Regions:
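Jelly-roll (double-stranded beta-helix
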Residues: 1-67, 72-250
Length: 250
């Protein structure tokens, strides 16, 4: 598969209200993302969470990065101030979350090291409809169903949908960290790139097969065209760049 660069303006993407199983209002802008790498599925989005949005304490069967842009992301064990980054690995509990103020940020989700296939939000919505049709119910982030024998099922809503789409019984992978990792970029110095003049980096962390960094370019600095073996996402948070003969503003 030929790998091409996809570049978009956040302002041009439709804001879609979330109609999932969590409490409170949330909305997002999903960026078009095709890695060009077979089997590598990522979901990257701009997110808004309103006052009153909440989730119970839970864990994922995928890895997730969050970069908080404005406000405070009010999550126990993963609290993010504006400008901070969090890594929420598969199998690691965190939360609950209850927003006492609105916040915005970026979210990136992808398959973790366990190899459990990543289920997209479109697939999750499909699963939710199917599970409701089968007699289940979603409330406060929990999926509940009464089995024919009278047994009551209570599981995390996301896990229930993922298991449904997988078509098999799943178990959470063992967490490789005690809790989510919060990265504070203000405590990281800018390090000059060894090869590129006017380019600096803050390498915040490397976690298994993924990593995250900030890059800063001085006026006139250039990053030459190159081909990567792995998928890479860049989001402009300040200033402007030129790419493909067009100027892009943050």
């Amino acid at each position: 598969m030929t790998r091409t660069v996809t570049i978009v303006n956040t302002a041009d993407i439709e804001l879609v209200e979330s109609k999932g199983s969590r409490e409170g209002r949330a909305a997002g802008k999903a960026f078009p993302l095709d890695t060009g790498i077979p089997g590598v599925i990522l979901e990257f989005s701009w997110r808004f969470y309103d006052k009153g949005y909440g989730t119970p304490r839970h864990r994922h069967i995928f890895d997730q990065y969050r970069y908080n842009l404005t406000g405070r992301r009010m999550i126990k064990d993963g609290f993010l101030e504006a400008g901070e980054v969090g890594f929420y690995p598969e199998g690691v509990y965190y939360g609950p979350q209850l927003q006492e103020e609105p916040c915005t940020g970026l979210g990136l989700q992808f398959q973790g090291l366990s190899g459990i296939p990543y289920i997209t939000h479109a697939q999750l919505r499909e699963a939710r409809k199917a599970l409701i049709a089968e007699g289940g119910a979603f409330k406060d982030g929990i999926y509940t169903k009464i089995e024919p024998d009278g047994h009551k099922v209570n599981v995390d809503s996301h896990f229930a949908c993922t298991q449904y789409m997988s078509g098999r019984k799943l178990s959470f992978p063992q967490g490789r960290f005690e809790k989510p990792i919060v990265m504070r970029p203000q405590g990281h110095p800018w390090i000059r790139d060894r090869k590129l003049e006017g380019v600096e980096h803050k390498r915040l962390g490397q976690f298994g097969g993924s990593g995250i960094r900030f890059t800063r370019l001085q006026p006139g600095a250039r990053i030459p065209a190159q081909r990567f073996e792995d998928a890479e996402i860049r989001y402009l948070v300040e200033g402007s760049i030129e790419y493909g003969g067009k100027t892009w503003q943050a």
